[in-house]
C-alpha cells in the first residue's frame, strides 16, 4: 500500500520493506552559485569560487533511515564512472584551477539510492 507520504510499502509478517529512494536530497555549498542538479543535466563549468568551498549533504531517507552518503569530484571531460566513491556527510574542496563537478549519492538502509550532481566549478586563489 502507499503511505501518506507516497512511499510504497510491502507489508510482510513482522516487517516492512522500504522500496522508495531517498527524497528531498540537497547538496549545500557555503558559497553561492552552486546548485543541486540531476545527473542527466548538461555539465557547465563557469562558476568561480574563491579559496575553497564546503559542501554538506542532506536527504529524507524515509522508513528505513540513512545508511550512508557518498561523493566524488569528477574533472571536466572525464566520465563519472571512472572515479571511486568516498563516504562522508560533508567535504571541502580546495584544489585550484581544476574544473570539476561533484556527484553525491544518498543510500538508505534498504539499499535504495538517489544520485545528484552539482554544476561544475573551479577554485581560484583570490
Segments predicted by a language model, with ranges:
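Low-complexity, disordered linker/stalk regions enriched in Pro/Thr/Ser/Gly
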Residues: 1-126
Amino acid at each position: 500500500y502507499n503511505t501518506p507520504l507516497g512511499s510504497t510499502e510491502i507489508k510482510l509478517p513482522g516487517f516492512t520493506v522500504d522500496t522508495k529512494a531517498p527524497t528531498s536530497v540537497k547538496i549545500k555549498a557555503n558559497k553561492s552559485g552552486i546548485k543541486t542538479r540531476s545527473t542527466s543535466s548538461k555539465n557547465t563549468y563557469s562558476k568561480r569560487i574563491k579559496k575553497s568551498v564546503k559542501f554538506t549533504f542532506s536527504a529524507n531517507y524515509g522508513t528505513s533511515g540513512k545508511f550512508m552518503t557518498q561523493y566524488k569530484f569528477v574533472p571536466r571531460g572525464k566520465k563519472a564512472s571512472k572515479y571511486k566513491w568516498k563516504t562522508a556527510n560533508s567535504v571541502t574542496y580546495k584544489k585550484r584551477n581544476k574544473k570539476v563537478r561533484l556527484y553525491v549519492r544518498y543510500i538508505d538502509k534498504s539499499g535504495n539510492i538517489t544520485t545528484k550532481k552539482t554544476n561544475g566549478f573551479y577554485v581560484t586563489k583570490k
